[in-house]
Amino acid sequence: GVDCIVSGAGLPMNLPEIVHKAEEVLAASGIRRATKLVPIVSTRKALDVIIKYWKKKYDTTPDMVVVEGPQAGGHLGFTPEELDSYTPASYDEEIKSILSKTKEMQIPCVVGGGVYTRQDWEHYADLGADGVQMATRFVTTEECDASMAYKQAYIQAKKEDIVIVKSPVGMPGRAIHNVFLDKVRQGERFMRGCRQCITTCNPATVPYCITEALINAVEG
């Protein structure tokens, strides 16, 4: 019954098909839904690929687009080399290119990744963004349902504690340094079964399940 699905950690190429099948099941029960589809992209190239594929195969387009830049937390849609090469100014050019496409198609576009202050929001508004996505800013609030231990890790983190890790998903990710990451770097494995959540993950070789790790983190 959700109103929209925001999908990232890879290109959601078959998202329209998955949602359409779910809507058909609901329709058979007399429930009519029109779920909005919102892909997360990091480059104009990724957006072009999604738009072209969705239009050709499903005759549909995104209802909104979220752009996540190289300063975002969690999974990042960049290679390690790209993370090193992008500057705020050079990534602004990427954002402008994405915005030119979304404006052309009259699709709202929201920018995220390193958005923390009013000045950040005003900067992206000046570029033409319709809104901003903010997550880290609100993790430590009372309204966030994460554990206090999880929130405390954010509060106590210093700049040097923020590290880039290689996720089992196959993408780089930004995380807070902790004992768990030290153990992974030392070669320990924490696989206790596979949830089959991501096709690019090989449970025989990855050191841990990303879904389990995220759940354990938020639960403290």
List each model region and its residues:
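Active-site entrance/lid segments in N-terminal catalytic domains of soluble metabolic enzymes
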Residues: G1-M105
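Conserved active-site-proximal phosphate/metal-binding subdomains
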Residues: P62, A72-V110, Y116-G220
